[in-house]
């Protein structure tokens, strides 16, 4: 058995986004429920830990996955919780792969956290270029809540 940790919010402000990511992981697991390693076939089991969309809960959820002896971790939706949990995964030597956590700080200085998505600075540049080329825009206004990790 290969156990993959699912480090996602199923509750809190980002719960809806976390559930969408989990649906994708569940679909992939349903389509490919086994993996061949060194000539042996293993069943893949998803092990869930709700980080609650909260940095303090994220550390507890990360520790829970470490204690459940997962082989690697997928997640999370939301960079703030990924940044908070990063040291836990790093200290345990447990690889984590961020699916949509776009903040560069998620992987900075962490040999065990990786990502499969674009970084915030890249996305910002692409959007600015698009707005300028498509609409001749020269100014942009963003509204965001200072309380979210994306604006800090």
Located regions from the model:
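Class I S-adenosyl-L-methionine
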Residues: 26-33, 132
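Short, charged loop segments at secondary-structure junctions
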Residues: 110
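Beta-alpha junction/loop-to-helix N-cap segments that form part of ligand/metal-binding clefts
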Residues: 16-21, 31, 35-107
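Active-site-proximal beta-strand/loop segments in catalytic clefts of secreted hydrolases
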Residues: 7-10, 49-52, 75-78, 99-102, ...
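Immediate post-signal peptide segment of exported/extracytoplasmic ligand-binding proteins
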Residues: 1-6, 37-43, 132-139
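Short beta-strand segments enriched in small/hydrophobic residues
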Residues: 1-22, 29, 76, 140-148
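An alpha-beta-alpha
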Residues: 10, 113-152
